[in-house]
Structures are given as structure tokens and as C-alpha cells.
């Protein structure tokens, strides 16, 4: 049953944007698992982030040109921005590897990137069923659960760093990498919360 007014272009653009989240996160996970050809592969993440920025801009442009929207104008803006934020931090994590010359990232970083992949996939599934107000909340709940897991992984990884890393410069680099990755999972949770609010307003 469709509870939201029909405007396929908005939903198409949101689907495109959420797909870029998954693509960027998968690229980052691959880099962290096997960090060869760093420069080229980080540029690939950057290219996906640029495509997402263009899609976000297209959503905002359409919003400004539309008299009737499928849900609150503010929520359209918030959803676009929050989805884009996830990829911004995914891209930032990738760039930390080049900036800090991290050639052997700690294993927990790939674990965190894997959680971002899972969150991005859940967000994409939630966006895909948003038009018909389908099982969006189930996907939002899973994103939030994964964020709790990421918090635990990040805390454990940082604690381990202070126990085992003897080089203070490396410690600072790795700690910041963990924090940027964990922030990406926080941003995914923020996006899920926006999705949830849209559904609850439409119920």
C-alpha cells in the first residue's frame, strides 16, 4: 500500500545515492583488507564520492523546483545530506591511508569498513521500499544494531592500540583512522533515523 505521494524521480535519485554508499564502502573494505595500489584505489573511492555529491545536488535542485513532494521538504533535504555524509566519511577514511602513509592498516579497520558495507546495504534496502512504506523500519533497526557493534569494535581496537603499539606516531595515525571509520557508522545511523522519522510521519 502506497502511503507517500508518487514522485518516482525523487525515489530514483535516493536509490542511486544509496547505491553509491555501498559501492564506496566496498571499495574501502577492499583497500583495508589488501592495501596495494593505494593511490589509484583511493581515487576510485573519491570518484564514487563525487558521483554521490552530484546526485545529492540533483535531489536538492529537484526539491527547489518541486511544488509537491513525496514527503516533507525538510526530510528530503535531511535524508540526502545524511546519506551523503556516510560516503564523505568513507572517503575521508580512504584518504587517511594516503595522507598518513598507512601501508599496513590494522585488521580492525577492515572490520569497521565491513560494518559500513552492511549498514550501506541496509540503507539501500530501506530506501528501495520507502515509496510503498514497506519494511523500512526493519532495515533502520539493523543499521542501528550494526552501529552498536561498530562502537564495540572501535573501543576494543583503540584499547588494543594503547596496549600494543609502541610507536606514538603510528598510534595517533591508527587511532584517527578508527575514529573516522566509526564516525561513518554514526552517520549511517543518523541516516537510518531520518528514514525512520519519514515513515513514522507517514503512518
Pin down the residues of each PLM region:
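Cytosolic, long alpha-helical scaffolding segments
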Residues: 1-203
Amino acid at each position: 500500500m502506497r502511503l507517500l505521494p508518487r514522485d518516482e524521480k525523487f525515489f530514483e535519485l535516493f536509490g542511486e545515492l544509496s547505491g553509491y554508499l555501498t559501492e564506496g564502502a566496498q571499495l574501502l573494505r577492499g583497500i583495508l583488507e589488501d592495501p596495494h595500489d593505494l593511490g589509484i584505489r583511493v581515487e576510485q573511492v573519491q570518484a564514487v564520492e563525487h558521483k554521490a555529491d552530484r546526485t545529492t545536488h540533483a535531489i536538492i535542485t529537484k526539491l527547489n523546483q518541486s511544488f509537491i513532494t513525496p514527503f516533507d521538504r525538510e526530510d528530503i533535504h535531511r535524508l540526502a545530506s545524511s546519506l551523503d555524509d556516510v560516503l564523505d566519511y568513507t572517503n575521508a577514511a580512504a584518504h587517511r591511508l594516503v595522507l598518513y602513509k598507512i601501508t599496513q592498516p590494522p585488521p580492525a579497520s577492515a572490520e569497521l569498513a565491513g560494518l559500513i558495507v552492511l549498514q550501506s546495504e541496509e540503507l539501500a534496502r530501506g530506501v528501495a521500499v520507502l515509496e510503498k512504506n514497506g519494511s523500512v523500519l526493519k532495515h533502520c533497526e539493523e543499521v542501528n544494531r550494526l552501529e552498536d557493534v561498530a562502537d564495540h569494535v572501535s573501543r576494543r581496537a583503540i584499547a588494543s592500540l594503547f596496549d600494543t603499539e609502541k610507536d606514538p606516531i603510528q598510534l595517533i595515525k591508527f587511532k584517527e583512522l578508527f575514529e573516522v571509520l566509526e564516525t561513518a557508522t554514526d552517520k549511517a545511523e543518523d541516516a537510518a533515523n531520518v528514514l525512520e522519522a519519514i515513515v513514522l510521519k507517514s503512518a
